[in-house]
């Protein structure tokens, strides 16, 4: 049995979980999230969410722990939320935002303007002498990761000097330059 899937998810105070017709809905102070599920049975009892599978088929074993983790992330999201920070490393790399529009200058001939989803709150930090930082916060972990990966994908860190967009705290694999 899945070690992750068999452990129940505790529902904290202020969070409501509803299960109906293969869809689970989690509501909390930060918002509401829904997730479809198949091949597993989700039940809510005694302030806990239980995920069970009907057989030991390979697909069901794979989805058992997955759906338990997704439900856990939904509950954490509507109570505490998630944060990701990206750092722009490079000369002339700048960032600014006007509402939900992110304006990135990453060394291309043009600025990249990205419309951020309304569920994600955006903050840009630019201090003199330090690398600019983009701070993203959301209650939806999947959407947050998707937006952060899209921003990072505009200029991935290169292995020689480390220039590019990287997550704060990310350790880059560096290469030695050519020897003379």
Where are these regions (language model features)?
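N-terminal intrinsically disordered, cationic/polar leader segments
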Residues: 2-149, 153-180
